[in-house]
């Protein structure tokens, strides 16, 4: 799939889900904040409870760019933890390596963060990790590989060019952007994680 087609699909998905998933989608979303399609602007019907819960699950999936099976596994793990399942779900997803690469400002989108990991540009505690789903533990250090830091995308990131579209660095990360290095200092708390999701609706979806 070409980058142009991928970007177009992200714009369409953003409009369908009601939230911008990429910086480019955000610009289009400002102009057309309604679902895609011939009758998108005119749609006013009330959604069923089923549709509302399904959409909320899809919104969370899209923000992390993960498959249904991955979200289901994370939910099953969250359900085994103490406390609120929905909050635990987001906290576990946020500790994915690709998510933390994005939050650290080393990439502009979750897709770019995943690509950096898959292409073996990212180290965890000095060792290459090429699995975007890798669970980072508190105290572990994420860094762009020294040989990769000279590449243009990472030079752009180190200069802080993505800060115009990314949320402020959350308190669970200690980031040295110029060194393309960050540390997960503690487990994220749901309230700190910059994703839009009604987690209770997602819990209700899986509890059907």
Curated annotation (Swiss-Prot):
UniProt lineage: Bacteria, Bacillati, Actinomycetota, Actinomycetes, Micrococcales
**Protein name per its UniProtKB record:** Small ribosomal subunit protein uS4
Q: Which GO terms describe its cellular component?
A: small ribosomal subunit
List the transmembrane segments. none
Q: Which GO terms describe its molecular function?
A: rRNA binding; structural constituent of ribosome
Output the Pfam families linked to this UniProt entry: Ribosomal_S4 (PF00163), S4 (PF01479)
Subunit-structure text:
Part of the 30S ribosomal subunit. Contacts protein S5. The interaction surface between S4 and S5 is involved in control of translational fidelity.
UniProt family annotation:
Belongs to the universal ribosomal protein uS4 family.
PANTHER family the UniProt entry points to: 30S 40S RIBOSOMAL PROTEIN, SMALL RIBOSOMAL SUBUNIT PROTEIN US4M
* Encoding gene (name): rpsD
Disordered: annotated segments: 28-48
Q: What does this protein do, in the record's words? A: One of the primary rRNA binding proteins, it binds directly to 16S rRNA where it nucleates assembly of the body of the 30S subunit.
Family annotation (CDD domains): S4
Keyword list (alphabetical) reads:
Ribonucleoprotein, Ribosomal protein, RNA-binding, rRNA-binding
Task: Output the GO biological process annotations, alphabetical, semicolon-separated.
Answer: ribosomal small subunit biogenesis; translation
Native organism is Beutenbergia cavernae (strain ATCC BAA-8 / DSM 12333 / CCUG 43141 / JCM 11478 / NBRC 16432 / NCIMB 13614 / HKI 0122)
Q: List the disulfide bonds.
A: none
Looking at the record, the residues that make up the S4 RNA-binding domain are: 95-159
